[in-house]
């Protein structure tokens, strides 16, 4: 006798792709995740709103984070709840995700709460069509297990809305940039690390650069286009592996891919914050397209507060009961010890000058600079994820 998952509202749609209900995914891996992540910020970098939500069908968990970064300060609310039977309700505690128009308009909101004195609501409006990224698939070091098998699309747009900190309300107008991504599949670092398998710790001597960045650019005539970079470089002695995707994105859906990218970055060694960089890009026709970018301010939400790479012994998708809500205020995220707790990857608002495209852009640069990289002054001793 076969068993089926419970019926949910989505089962009324004509979108089934496996022989089961929408309460079930096609495999039993506990790391299966569907996730959204978004940011919004005015171009002056005075403040940034952050949002993330994950659905872990095989863990019966839906969790989320919402936060505000303002200069060196950061406020975060995290929530986790039992997924079943309310699998279609995309909310956990005070945090809510709502699709207003598919692939076009989304609302991200944080209601007033008892954790930290912040709340917000912003509506993402697409400036460009969503862009499906290449399938991201990584194996364990021994090659025996697929650690990550993810499909992701990102979208570049603008934001309108409001935010409140300590009872003082500010507005987000349509000049603010907003980026979002939506992914699903088997992810790394879901749930506490397994204790009965080989230690996956990073080998000494390995250096890594990861850059992921969607940018909204505008020319003097008001026309818009996007830039997207997803660059990963792993180096060990004379061995090196580079993965690259991205390019120029046009409003009509056309995409001009990057063939090669060479980053030249200035990064603080003590907290691994990206200050500025030149990305020497080569297009598929062989032409060069250098991109000059710089962090707009100290503002930038540390994603570790949303449980990326874990936080204080807790992880994405971890069972916390029927409903659990927590969070914290951090006074200075640039402090090296604090940066290690929150990890270095963050939603860093950057300004980009694209001389070839004749545009200036603003967007989100997530970066990791791990290991010793003496060519840019980074030491092994100061390295952390």
Show where each model-derived region lies:
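Structured soluble/peripheral alpha/beta segments that form catalytic or ligand/cofactor-binding pockets
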Residues: 1-385
């Amino acid at each position: 006798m076969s068993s089926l998952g419970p019926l949910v509202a989505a089962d009324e749609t004509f979108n089934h792709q496996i022989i089961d209900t929408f309460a079930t995914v096609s495999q039993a891996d506990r790391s299966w995740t569907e996730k959204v992540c978004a940011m919004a910020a005015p171009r002056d970098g005075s403040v940034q709103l952050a949002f993330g939500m994950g659905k872990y069908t095989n863990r019966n968990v839906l969790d989320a984070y919402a936060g505000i970064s303002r200069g060196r300060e950061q406020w975060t609310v995290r929530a986790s709840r039992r997924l079943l039977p309310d699998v279609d309700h995309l909310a956990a505690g005070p945090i809510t995700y709502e699709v207003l128009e598919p692939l076009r308009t989304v609302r991200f909101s944080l209601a007033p709460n008892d954790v930290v004195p912040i709340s917000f609501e912003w509506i993402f409006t697409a400036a460009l069509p969503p862009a499906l990224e290449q399938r991201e698939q990584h194996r364990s070091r021994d090659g025996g297990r697929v650690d990550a098998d993810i499909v992701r699309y990102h979208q570049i747009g603008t934001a309108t809305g409001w935010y409140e900190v300590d009872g003082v309300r500010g507005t987000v107008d349509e000049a603010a940039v907003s980026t979002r991504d939506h992914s699903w599949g088997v992810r790394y670092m879901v749930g506490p690390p397994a204790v009965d398998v080989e230690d996956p710790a990073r080998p000494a001597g390995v250096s890594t650069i990861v850059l992921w960045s969607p940018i909204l650019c505008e020319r003097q005539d008001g026309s818009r286009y996007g830039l997207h970079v997803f660059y990963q470089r792993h180096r060990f002695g004379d061995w090196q592996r580079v993965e690259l995707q991205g390019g120029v994105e046009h409003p009509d859906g056309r995409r001009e891919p990057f063939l090669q990218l060479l980053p030249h970055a200035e990064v603080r060694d003590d907290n691994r914050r990206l200050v500025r960089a030149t990305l020497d890009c080569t297009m598929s026709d062989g032409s060069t397209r250098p991109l000059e970018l710089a962090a707009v301010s100290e503002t930038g939400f540390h994603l570790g507060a949303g449980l990326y790479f874990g936080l204080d012994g807790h992880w994405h998708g971890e069972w916390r009961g029927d409903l659990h809500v927590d969070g914290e205020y951090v006074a200075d995220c640039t402090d090296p010890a604090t940066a290690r707790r929150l990890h270095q990857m963050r939603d860093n608002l950057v300004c980009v000058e694209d001389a070839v495209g004749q545009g200036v852009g603003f967007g989100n640069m997530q970066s990791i600079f791990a290991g010793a990289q003496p060519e840019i002054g980074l030491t092994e001793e100061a390295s952390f994820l």
